[in-house]
Amino acid sequence: MEEGERSPLLSQETAGQKPLSVHRPPTSGCLGPVPREDQAEAWGCSCCPPETKHQALSGTPKKGPAPSLSPGSSCVKYLIFLSNFPFSLLGLLALAIGLWGLAVKGSLGSDLGGPLPTDPMLGLALGGLVVSAASLAGCLGALCENTCLLRGFSGGILAFLVLEAVAGALVVALWGPLQDSLEHTLRVAIAHYQDDPDLRFLLDQVQLGLRCCGAASYQDWQQNLYFNCSSPGVQACSLPASCCIDPREDGASVNDQCGFGVLRLDADAAQRVVYLEGCGPPLRRWLRANLAASGGYAIAVVLLQGAELLLAARLLGALAARSGAAYGPGAHGEDRAGPQSPSPGAPPAAKPARG
């Protein structure tokens, strides 16, 4: 058949029909490739706004803005942000102080693997990092309504609660052995008094606060290489200034030599200058006296974390309900659409038989 004969047939077949158009995949306003639906909806971690993400996945046009949260859910959202913001600042401050302390000790040539089981500055830095990370996740997750960050925040709070429960159970079960190990810990700190500036600061604060000297008695300082009477240095047979009854000696600054030569004196002469009682018994008495207050603080922290966990769960539920209401079945007009006219090429529908 010639070309001229085929043209009328083609025009008759296509008469009354809309011209065919090439189907193009839907695009979104977000940068990067369109995410898979199962990956994008799994954790709510997409960088796109919810309505834009759903348009990119389904190809449906935008019908309107996403519904806003209810007043109660909005209150929960800002309550999570405001309650975590101070902890974020405190965590970042602790992290900065810990890193600064580690940098100073490194510049002084100090060994980070010192006599303490964990370096105080390293513990401060790690604690600040964990607290600031969890608090910032709660702040940003609530403020930006990001379910991924809110789930991470909830997981962190839950991990804190589990660790605190385990630590509390261990303290209750091992309370007696922990008290018995105090004097041993103090003797280790005395032997390494000059090795670590943080250790020296902590031991000085314990002796000044409890008005004591040594572990069991002031003679425990004989275990220190610098204060031992056999030492050739100028500190031989001496005690640190934190053992002195009046370290300032009515002056403006601490007299570091107030305890020099005290270990050569008898007990009657030494008690006029330094404290003779060790820090083990006063430390045990202090722990027993403050046990109720420490337990109250621990319970308050646990209750606060439990409240944060419940608020995060409430906000996650509200966000999930809003997403389901906005993008569930019938939200885009599929179920609300009226009857559609049949296509020109479709066969006519059969009429019901009359009785």
UniProtKB/Swiss-Prot annotation:
**This protein's UniProt keywords:** Cell membrane, Disulfide bond, Glycoprotein, Membrane, Transmembrane, Transmembrane helix
Q: Which processes are annotated in GO (biological process)?
A: establishment of protein localization to organelle
> Which InterPro entries has this protein been placed in?
Tetraspanin/Peripherin (IPR018499), Tetraspanin_CS (IPR018503), Tetraspanin_EC2_sf (IPR008952)
Region entry Disordered, spans: 1-33, 327-355
Summarize tissue expression: Expressed in the eye, including iris, ciliary body, retinal pigment epithelium, but not lens (protein level).
Give the glycosylated residues.
N228
Q: Which residues form a coiled coil?
A: none
This protein is called Tetraspanin-10
Species the sequence originates in: Homo sapiens (Human)
Lineage of producing organism: Eukaryota, Metazoa, Chordata, Craniata, Vertebrata
